[in-house]
Amino acid sequence: MAPRLDFSDWWAKDTRKGTPVVVKMENPNYSVVEIDGPDSAFRPVEKSRGKNAKQVTWVLLLKAHRAVGCLTWLATVFWSLLGAIKKRLSFTHPLGSEKLGRDRWLFTAIKLFLAVSLVILGFEIVAYFRGWHYFQSPSLHIPTSTLEIQSLFHLVYVGWLTLRADYIAPPIKALSKFCIVLFLIQSVDRLVLCLGCFWIKYKKIKPRFDEEPFRNDDAEGSGSEYPMVLVQIPMCNEREVYEQSISAVCQLDWPKDRILVQVLDDSNDESIQQLIKAEVAKWSQKGVNIIYRHRLVRTGYKAGNLKSAMSCDYVEAYEYVAIFDADFQPTPDFLKLTVPHFKDNPELGLVQARWTFVNKDENLLTRLQNINLCFHFEVEQQVNGVFLNFFGFNGTAGVWRIKALEESGGWLERTTVEDMDIAVRAHLHGWKFIYLNDVKVLCEVPESYEAYKKQQHRWHSGPMQLFRLCLGSILTSKIAIWKKANLILLFFLLRKLILPFYSFTLFCIILPLTMFVPEAELPVWVICYIPVFMSFLNLLPSPKSFPFIVPYLLFENTMSVTKFNAMVSGLFQLGSSYEWIVTKKAGRSSESDLLSITEKETPTKKSQLLRGVSDSELLELSQLEEQKQAVSKKPVKKTNKIYHKELALAFLLLTAALRSLLAAQGVHFYFLLFQGVTFLLVGLDLIGEQMS
């Protein structure tokens, strides 16, 4: 712990020797002379003409104007922030608060930590103003004799210092060193992934296939050489996006007699079911081979939906299955860019495409998500695909060989990450994967913090569930030992367990603790230098996001609370780890989609479409269309929420920032201050979509 300095010493540690003296003359013909102490004699003599008093005055006025402008801007931002906080706190809607449920244990622990911190801070403030500054310094010591004790409060404070140094500091030091080691290991892993990505770019390594793998000699568009492809669109209450995904899939460029589209609707809202039925009927009348499926018994969430669809008898005639979530819009050439990779490659089980986001610039939250997902696809998926032929299936925008699914056990309902589950089991059975970074499928990222938080909870609790369930299968499988080590040590432990553990423990628990236990101080390079460098690496795949490097770093630390809580829930089988909540979508469209929407179908086209349709079918279609228009007009109520854990951590970090201010720790103070403000903004749901 650095010795205590006065506030004037803190902000002006590097003052030069000597006092500068400025002599101003009333006569403008004289120059201004500056005497700056003994070191000025060793400076080179400037031969340029000196500035007169009027020029100096104008320079000072300009600097003062800039300073006032900066202060005005800061005051405006601060006032706007206070106004937003006041407005959010005055919100009294019953749905405007987060439901903690079974995850209350973490919130209780944070509240207890905050209460203890406030008590200790009160002791420290009183001791500071009484002049008791017993930090680690050769010139200062903790009084031990009764003659040095001034009062009962002084005795209690000295007892706290002794307890802190002898019993509290050692375990905190050990835990901090352990977390720092994990932090360094994860940083090395991230650096190796980036180097692998650079090597792929330098060598221009990417999967390739023959230019014309399938020939189509039939003039009417049916090709016997094209394999049979099943396309599945699982959805559940996807009112905003169902039309876009069905439309995009129905326009895939593939022989009509070699493709079947399954719309797997798990919606429990009958009005949404009618909307989807109408959309399917519309495309069926256009000649698309498409069917609508709705389960009466909705078990197993998405995995149960896919498992039920694969049990149909007609699936046996198909060789490959492409899966798209309800908000995904593949390009017409998607199948022609992915399916040919399976030809002459019998060991290939999966071809995964990249995601791109139509709403990545919608707000700050979507921009920060885009940074993470760009790194995931550009670096993690691509490197693992090239060097290991294995990565986690992303659940959508991929094509599976149906034989690989069947040999691996098919879709299982045991976890909420059925995509990762089937990928691990297929890898254990020897199937290889290919990732195509150049094939991109348009989709959405969550625009509200509520939707994003629920998505991240599922993405981080599910892998821990899966790790417990498949650890035995990994150890007893027949794959190579290095593949087993990669699965256990890197895929699960390092990237799914250690990452959320150390990020939350180190920056949200240990760092505030070290402010109250200065004997266990964290070095500056752990707090500042390495995190900034790692954030820089994360931003490399999305260079346009470099202005957001500081918000990205602070927001990732904030999200560590959700990820840590989810990881613990999945590892210890808590109730929240089994919850599946469909991520809310906004129904954003690309520019091409918006242009196509404006081009309405003419009456001539409609008459051509309905030619040959019976009167009963025509009546049914018209009724479905009327229901579609009526249901689509229903308003959907949305509200922002208040998140208790984030707010409690905000006050904890701000309390620790005040303690670091007393100890004159500049870097620690600024980090805790900005991180605390970030937690405050997130806790009040002031990031992402703002709803009335």
Swiss-Prot record:
SUPFAM superfamilies: Nucleotide-diphospho-sugar transferases. The chain crosses the membrane at residues 106-126, 180-200, 497-517, 522-542, 646-666, 667-687. Glycans are attached at N29, N394. It is a multi-pass membrane protein. One of its GO terms (molecular function) is protein homodimerization activity. The active site is at D266, D419. Mainly expressed in flowers and seeds, and, to a lower extent, in seedlings, roots, leaves and stems. This is Probable xyloglucan glycosyltransferase 5. It comes from Arabidopsis thaliana.
